[in-house]
Regions:
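N-terminal catalytic cores of NTP/NDP-binding nucleotidyl/phosphoryl-transfer enzymes
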Residues: 47-109, 160, 236-238, 242-244, ...
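Residue patterns forming the tRNA-binding/recognition surfaces of aminoacyl-tRNA synthetases
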Residues: 2-18, 22-25, 31, 35-39, ...
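Alpha-helical recognition segments enriched in aromatics with Gly/Pro capping
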Residues: 357-369, 473-475, 494-646
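Short functional micro-motifs and their immediate structural scaffolds
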Residues: 200, 421, 492, 534-536, ...
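Secondary-structure capping and boundary motifs in well-ordered enzyme cores
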Residues: 49, 53-59, 71-74, 78, ...
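Cys/His-coordinated zinc-binding microdomains
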Residues: 196, 472, 488, 531-532, ...
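Protease-associated
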Residues: 245, 249, 256-342, 348
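Acidic, turn-prone loop/beta-hairpin segments
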Residues: 100, 189, 193, 200-207, ...
Length: 926
């Protein structure tokens, strides 16, 4: 019988750790949430940084009418990452989560879900129901955000229905009114006939629809002596026949040429017809109208036709020909006839044209979208239906030249998804013209990410209408306006605003509906116009964008936070939403932008790039993801993305992220397992570290610098890739693999082993802090498994300082030298792999490698032979001059190592004694 081999495993320093290989995040994270995050961590972080420089990221409030979705998750994870990083850098960084609660969506859902008839219950009861509804979803969303690891003052969020928030908002309105920026006017606004309210620009979305464009003949009644008016028509073109009852004029281009085209005799009534059309469009229109026999009998310059009167086809009034301009109706020759149907009640440009030329205004559609008596025989018809009936009437009565099917982009309500209309109604407006130049200047003071955001916002402000701030709803902040009972004059004073603020601060805005006007106006209030002392209240509420757009005052100033905020971060749709409404109110009230920086993100789409929607059934719930993969996987997904663009999300993508997570986790686990007996209070001095350790610290130093820059510039995708590269390439595939022999086989308390442990500890300590803003749950788990110095013996890495680079570790000479060594390793690795495939060796320790080189290359290899052997993890290495392989820069030969395999370290040696190589024998004897 052969002699039984001894078991030397008990003499090795094998890894020991309770840190599991598998994260089991869905189970572990809720435990961490309860034990750490919900145990006063946020307050402890603020206390640690008290008195330090502030950093305020102001939270754009999500609408509290449903559970959190993937877009919410992306947004809040980005915010949480920034705030965590800033706090670890020592900033006093409070985060006050917000909730948007007022307005139409909540009203609609409350009515649908609870079966309410709004007209049959008191306003205050209806408002209380809306409040209960939105409070429920606010609580649901709060739990959702906390599950994602988002830290903040969840016990004291700001909610747009809070009394103090509402009172401050009323103050913002009062300040703008005092400065003359608020006025009441009859102007066209976006109007949803289903919701029966005006809409903001940010509340509309465009969809492609198929409709009918019509070419309509307006008979000339007064030609100003330019031509014979008999049987002569000006032809207009419109895609909205329902607006024809509002037609008050026909706009043409002053500098265009117009032709009077005579058609051949009409067979039915044997009369000649003459049509006036822009010369450039005659051929196109005639072809569309299927008219082949025609001739031009007269031409005019557009300016000559100004003042010509045409009879409205079906109403008893005239339509005057007027001249367009760049600031009113801008007539083009791309489509139509060069003569634009102008209805001042139904469009911004038409309205401005009407003002310029005193055309007057007729609003022939009511709140519900039905034509009124002003529409003549079409009264009572829903506007969309009247498109067909008006077109049919025009055809039957000889006024329709042609109807053509077209596909065009049309505005829809973002809530009910139904088409909307432009319609003039009496509304309250904020006059953007009053402070537009100041807003444009303020935009230039802001740092925009991406930088094209500055141009985008500037162009929007340059072209935007006055802001319609009134809404015909009840769930919201009331417009704090009284009207004189006798003469109807609006009554708004500093005293009335203050009185309403005082009432709202204690009783909330329900008081506006619960109390009589006499109990809300200041004592001694009199109408400035007629002296009457009796008033009635405005019934409209403020646009919800005024709610959230005022939070720089109602939250930042009200709570004593920094104003302007350091950062606003929202989706790229908020250029026309919250970014803009906040900018307008802030400049109007204080003359400054409400933010120093603006960062925007894209939308979340599915794996195929499609928008997530209920109809497609492709929505992804962040809570479902957290319960299946873990919130840290969702956090890594968000931070790995190019969030400035739309971000794809699917199970396959999350599985890929999980693979990266496992590599990061296993790097941490390896280090934890090999530092179980290391005391961080007793590090090995830098000069006593081995050269490969010093190289590892150069890589760590680079990681710290790169990730610091990445976090500072919000380049989270770069940070994710830097960490992944460091863990996989620098650590797992190189450094940690190479030092395994030293860790396992050297004497436990030897300088060599302690040097490796010191280096690994520095690496893990920095790595866990870099990871804390990213994968906060896992970082807490790693932190609790680590040994710590007394100085950093804190319960959470969030209470530690973010790592800083160490100048001593910046060893350029070592970095350059090891870059060459790594190149050698990569060349030899291919030959080792080939030998393994050919069964020459089992693993690299079975190998003896010979490298052939010459000149400086040979000299470098010879000088660093021991280091190269260490890096290759082989039992034997020879460096020989010349005889290299022709096809490669280095010649490499791999053969099986000679001697016998040491039973302890597994290296081959020619001088084994009792199964041990001389090195292992020496270690055991010590």
């Amino acid at each position: 019988m052969s002699e039984e081999k001894k078991d030397y495993s008990c003499t090795l320093n094998l890894p020991k750790t309770d840190f599991p290989m598998r994260g089991n995040l869905p189970t572990k994270e809720p435990e961490t949430l309860k034990a750490v995050f919900e145990n006063g961590l946020y307050e402890k972080i603020l206390k640690k940084n008290e008195g330090h420089k502030h950093f305020v990221l102001h939270d754009g409030p999500p609408y509290a009418n449903g559970e959190i979705h993937a877009g919410h998750a992306l947004n809040k994870i980005l915010k949480d990452t920034i705030v965590r990083y800033k706090a670890m850098k020592g900033f006093y960084a409070p985060f006050i989560p917000g909730y948007d609660t007022h307005g139409m969506p909540t009203e609609k859902k409350a009515i649908e879900k609870l079966g309410l008839d709004r007209s049959k219950i008191p306003v205050t009861k209806f408002r209380d129901t809306c409040r209960e509804f939105t409070t429920n979803y606010k609580d649901i969303q709060t739990e959702g955000f906390k599950r994602l690891g988002v830290l903040g003052d969840w016990a004291h969020p700001y909610i747009t229905y809070d009394h103090a928030t509402e009172a401050r908002q009323i103050g913002v309105f009062g300040d703008m009114y005092k400065k003359g920026y608020i006025y009441k006017g009859l102007k066209p606004v976006y109007w949803c006939t289903d919701c029966e309210t005006a809409l903001a620009e940010a509340e509309i979305e465009y969809k492609d629809v198929t409709g009918e464009s019509i070419y309509v003949k307006f008979p000339v009644e007064d030609s100003k002596g330019l031509f014979d008016k008999k049987d002569t028509y000006v032809v207009i073109w419109t895609t909205t026949p329902w607006t024809l009852p509002g037609n008050m004029g026909i706009t043409i281009g002053a500098d265009y040429e117009y032709s009077m085209v005579e058609l051949k005799e009409n067979k039915e009534d044997s009369k000649l017809e003459r049509l006036i059309i822009a010369t450039e469009l005659v051929e196109k229109v005639m072809k569309l109208a299927e008219v082949e026999d025609y001739k031009t009998v007269q031409t005019f310059k557009g300016s000559e036709l100004e003042g010509v009167l045409c009879k409205h086809p079906f109403l008893d009034r005239m339509s005057r020909v007027v001249l367009g301009s760049e600031t009113t109706v801008n007539v083009t020759l791309d489509e139509g006839t060069g003569a634009v149907h102008t209805a001042p009640a139904y469009g911004k440009e038409d309205y401005l044209q009407g003002l310029k030329d005193k055309l007057g205004m007729v609003v022939a559609v009511d709140d519900k979208g039905k034509q009124t008596a002003e529409a003549g025989e079409f009264a009572g018809q829903f506007y969309a239906k009247s498109n067909k009936t008006i077109t049919a009437w025009l055809d039957e009565n000889g006024y329709l030249l042609k109807a053509v099917k077209i596909e065009h982009s049309y505005p829809h309500c973002w809530r009910c998804k139904k088409p909307i209309i432009f319609r003039a109604t009496p509304q309250w407006f904020a006059s953007v013209d009053g402070f537009r130049d100041d807003v444009l200047k303020a935009i230039k003071t802001v740092t925009w990410h991406p930088d094209w955001g500055e141009d985008r916002m500037s162009e929007m402000i340059k072209g935007r209408n006055d802001w319609c701030i009134s809404r015909q709803r009840t769930w919201g902040v009331p417009l704090p306006i009284f009207y004189c009972k006798d003469c109807g004059e609006p009554y708004v004073t500093e005293e009335s605003i203050k009185k309403i603020q005082d009432v709202v601060r204690t009783e909330g805005t329900n008081a506006w509906w619960a109390k009589e006007a006499k109990d809300l106006v200041p004592e001694g209030a009199k109408c400035p116009k007629c002296g009457c002392t009796e008033f009635k209240k405005e019934t409209d509420i403020m646009d919800v964008w005024f709610d959230s757009g005022s939070t720089h005052q109602s939250v930042l100033v009200e709570r004593g936070l920094d104003y302007p905020a350091d950062l606003y971060l929202e989706g790229n749709d908020q250029y026309r939403g919250w970014f803009q409404s906040s900018l307008l109110t802030s400049v109007a009230v204080n003359g400054i932008a409400p933010y120093k920086e603006v960062l925007c993100c894209g939308f979340v789409v599915d794996g195929q790039g499609r928008k997530m929607s209920k109809s497609l059934g492709n929505g992804v719930s962040p809570i479902d993801v957290s319960n299946k993969f873990g919130a840290d996987i969702l956090r890594l997904w968000a931070l790995s993305s190019d969030y400035s663009m739309d971000v794809n999300l699917s199970d396959d993508i999350l599985k890929g992220i999980s693979d990266v997570y496992r590599k990061i986790r296993n790097t941490a686990r390896y280090i934890l397992g090999n530092t179980y007996d290391y005391d961080p209070e007793k590090p090995v001095a830098y000069e006593d570290l081995q050269e490969i350790d010093k190289w590892a610290l150069t890589r760590l130093n680079k990681l710290i610098k790169d990730c610091t820059k990445d976090y500072d510039t919000y380049s989270f995708g770069n940070c994710y890739h830097d960490v992944n590269q460091f863990c996989v390439v620098d650590m797992s595939s190189f450094y940690l693999d190479i030092i395994k022999d030293r860790l396992y086989t050297e004497k436990a308390d030897s300088v060599a082993r302690r040097a490796a442990q010191t280096t690994m500890y520095y690496i893990l300590d920095a790595l866990v802090k870099i990871l804390t803003p990213m994968i906060s749950f896992t970082a807490e788990e790693i932190w609790s498994a680590m040994n710590h110095t007394e100085k950093e013996n804190v319960e959470s890495p969030m209470l530690a300082d973010y790592p800083v680079s160490n100048d001593e570790w910046d060893n350029k000479e070592i970095a350059e030298k090891w870059e060459k060594i790594i190149k050698v390793k990569n060349i030899v690795a291919k030959d080792l792999e080939l030998a393994r495939a050919e069964k020459t060796i089992g693993n690299s320790l079975d190998a003896k490698v010979t490298i052939y080189a010459e000149g400086e290359e040979y000299k470098f290899l010879k000088e660093n032979e021991e280091l190269i052997k260490l890096v290759l993890i082989v039992s034997g290495l020879e460096i020989q001059e010349n005889n290299r392989k022709q096809e490669e820069k280095l010649g490499v030969k791999v053969e099986h190592a000679t001697g016998e395999k040491c039973e302890r370290c597994w290296m081959y040696n020619d001088h084994l004694e009792d199964g041990l190589c001389p090195r292992c024998k020496e270690v055991l004897e010590k």
